[in-house]
Amino acid sequence: MNKKTFYLTTPIYYVNDIPHIGHSYTTIAADALARYKRIQHFDVFFLTGTDEHGQKIQKAAQACNKTPIEFVNSVVKKFNTLWNKLNISQDDFIRTTSEHHCLRVKKLFQQLYEKGDIYLGEYEGRYCVPCESFWLESQLEQDKCPECKRTTEKVKEKNYFFRLSKYQKRLLDFYHQHPNFVQPESRKNEILQRIKSPIEDISISRSAVEWGIPVPMDPTHTIYVWIDALLNYITALGNDEDTRKFQKYWPADVHIIGKEILWFHGVIWPAVLMSLKIDLPRKIFAHGWWTVEGKKISKSLGNAIDPLAIIQTYGVDAYRYFLLREVPFGLDGNFSYPALVHRINADLGNDLGNLLQRTLTMIEKYFQGTIPVVVDSEDELRSLSQDTHDKIAGEMEELQFSRALENIWEFIGHANKYIEEKKPWTLAKSSAATPQLIRVLGTLARALQDISVFIYPFMPITTEKIQRQLGLLESNSSLHLEFQQNFREGTVIRKENPLFPRIEKESVLTERVVSE
């Protein structure tokens, strides 16, 4: 039987500088969803990558006395290093400088031109180099970019334009017919208001930028970086040559993006697909920003956070957990090291870590390290575990990672409460209570096994550590990711150091800028 497919993407990240917390947030969220869908037996295709053309990169390379390709190669290595450290499980990493992407973009651009949706005109207005965005004078205050607040440049040049205005009604109709196309609801309402306002055709080429894909019918122009970038979602599937892969996975089930690029994904991208007569993605989820003291995190503001420094100090899974637990996905969140340390000490150390440590200590003390086996009818936490499993499914469907984790920690709380109520240390004092002691510790072991499956999408390393200590993993065996499995008779625990040792206040990092 063929598995049901699930195609999800992050944006491809602009490589004018090294990756920061915002890049890692989007990618960790996508990775958690990909891992969850895999253990639900979906055939997952998870795409991420890098956006490597444009004026900003051309200027950044010049400032470093490098060619553009030398510059982007050096930055792409840093993205790959961070993704490896974060245990990102992407199925493909696309680069817009790759030959196959460039060839496919040219073909698609040519198709848009032949359909009459691209024409040569003259653009006169303002352009933001850092955001690679065109703006009308009427959209600006004091010539400042509405997104990054930097001063825009006055531009007047011949450009090729895409007939975006032609698709205004079709876009509105599509949004009304697909009310869940953009999530969360507040973002959808914002973008709908913009679509209802007059929409102008957009410039999709540059004549003064050399670093880009040449326009196929006019090599004196290069294709605007945002059109080049958006097309990655279909070029990665080999839309022209390997049509089987494209037919298998498209349309994408979800594009996970930051809210600042919703116009491109929620308006321009659907219109381009409509022109190409390609189905639109099923969902776009635009999450919020991380802030420090209420300001968006960015290197230019001097408040960027270095993910590698956090990982080195606090661990990968603690970082992944914090980002996905601290803030409901879709809202803005404020980052602070004290908040991170509190989550580690309270949630990971006290709640989860102590549950594992106490359970294993009692199994070691009362059963010589062999996990007592219980049957379902004796397992008093099993129905709560099933409820948790079902709640997680609902939250993950809505990309509500924080609420999914809240449900997991509620179950962890039930397991800790179960220890206090059953008092296994008291049961151990009477041989007559041995059957009860077997039931209690066997129930706790099975609860921990279920917890290890629940947390896997968010904290895969911790899942491995728990399952190894529960005696489930041989030297080369794979993780046990099926829900509510029974222990084999004679399974012996392998107690190790605490999962998350307590962090003292004096070891807390201060806010630090991304390292050069």
Explain the meaning of each model-derived region.
Residues 32, 70-81, 351-358, 387, ...:
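A non-catalytic, amphipathic alpha-helix used as a structural packing/dimerization or gating element
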Residues 1-5, 45, 49, 121-126, ...:
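Basic, alpha-helical terminal appendages of large translation-related enzymes
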Residues 2, 142-143, 177-179, 218, ...:
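Short, glycine- and charge-enriched coil/turn segments that flank and shape catalytic ligand pockets
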Residues 2-180:
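N-terminal, positively charged nucleic-acid-binding surface of large information/translation enzymes
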Residues 344, 348-351, 355, 377, ...:
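Amphipathic alpha-helix face/heptad-repeat signature
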Residues 1-48, 100-104, 155-365, 406-408:
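Structured secondary-structure scaffolds
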Residues 262, 323-326, 330, 339, ...:
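Active-site-proximal binding-pocket segments
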Residues 68, 184-187, 348, 374-381, ...:
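Residue-level recognition of alpha-helical structural elements
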